[in-house]
Structures are given as C-alpha cells and as structure tokens.
Amino acid sequence: MKPLTGTPMGEAVDSLPNRRSLAKLQTRQKVLAAARQMFAQQGYEGATIRDIATAAGMSTGAVFANFTDKSDLFCDIMNTDVESLVAAMEEAVAGETGVESALTTLFNAGYRFYQSQLPMARAAFSVAWTPDHGHVVRNLPSLRQLKAMITDQLEAGVARGELVSQAEIPLRTSMLFNIFLSNFPPAIFHGCAPEELEARARNQVRIVLAGALKA
C-alpha cells in the first residue's frame, strides 16, 4: 500500500483556525480603515454603518460581525489614536526636568500629533458630549493614561521641590487636561497653527502652576 504524502491531517486542521483568525483580523482592519475615512469626511453623525460597509467593500453584516454599533467602531479608533498619542507624548517629554517645561512639551506633542488628523479630532469632540455615547468616549482607558501623565509630571514637580506639597494635584490635573482639550477648537475651526497653540498652552500652563510654585 502506497503511503500517503503531503500535509499531515493534524497540521491541516490546526492551520484552519489560524487562517480564520487572520481573515477576521484583516476584515476588522479593513472596516476600521473605512470607518476612519468616513468619520473624517462626514463626521460621526453623518457617517452611517452602510457608508462604512460600502467604503470597505463589505456588507453591513460583516461590519456588525466585528463591531456592535457605530459608537463601538468609533471608540476603537479613538482609543488606538490616543494610545499612539500617549506614546508620542512620552517620547517627547523624556529628559525634561522642569514641571512647566514638561507639561508644555506634553501639550505641544499632542497638538502636533493631531495636526494631520483634525477631522477626526472634530468628530471626537462631537461624540464626547452626546448624551448616548459621550461618557464612553470621555472614559476611554487611553484618555485616563493621558490624565495620569499630567498627574505624574505634577507629582514629579512636588518631589523635585518645584511645587508646594499641597499642590492640589487632582484639581490641577483636571484643569490642565481641560486646557489641553480647549486648544483644539481654535485649530479645528479657525486654522490655528501648532506654533500658536504652543504659545497659548505655555501661558496657560504657567498660570495654572503659578499658585503652586514654591517661593
């Protein structure tokens, strides 16, 4: 009897889940790319699941097989973007030894990161204050990371003796985070260049820290 040749049956069966997983991942990535394009072009409210499916060359069923709804899609994109933003900020601030300089550098890195993605930033602001999905966007894990970076810099300022021990760090973290966000609308709606945002942020950081600086 002639022995069988070729791929053993076990290996063939084992490879099937891998191929399925790869195909599912590729489909998911294709949907995300199409959704990013639609959100940037039409805004969050304007883009529909049908638009996204058409742009991806898929059925709406294929989109729903990967995401529960439009907000799920948008939050996935936003969380990925903010994770990349946090990484860019961490790289930018490495080596900074002064709290004011470090915070200004963090903010500047953020503005430059989004300079080429302002339509997505506009969509994010639109979703962030909707009653249905705003709380989800505002509480993304990556945004909590961003706030934690601000807290870390304030705590480092206290440890170095730049700031007083009673610096009300939670309050100042919240104020500085809101300041960081407040500079996006001038860029989105009025075309402010990164240099203008940086100058504005520098003054804002200085004012917020003024009451906590050691004499």
PLM feature spans:
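Amphipathic alpha-helical segments used for helix-helix packing
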Residues: 115-134, 185-189
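Key DNA-contact positions within bacterial/archaeal DNA-binding proteins
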Residues: 61
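Basic, helix-initiating cap at the start of DNA-binding domains
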Residues: 1-42, 49-58, 72
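Amphipathic C-terminal alpha-helical segment
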Residues: 112-116, 152, 156, 174-195, ...
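Amphipathic alpha-helical packing segments from all-alpha helical-bundle domains
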Residues: 83-86, 116, 134-160, 170-174, ...
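An amphipathic alpha-helix adjacent to DNA-recognition modules
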Residues: 25-33, 45-46, 57, 65-90, ...
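Hydrophobic alpha-helical connector segments
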Residues: 76, 90-119, 169, 173-176
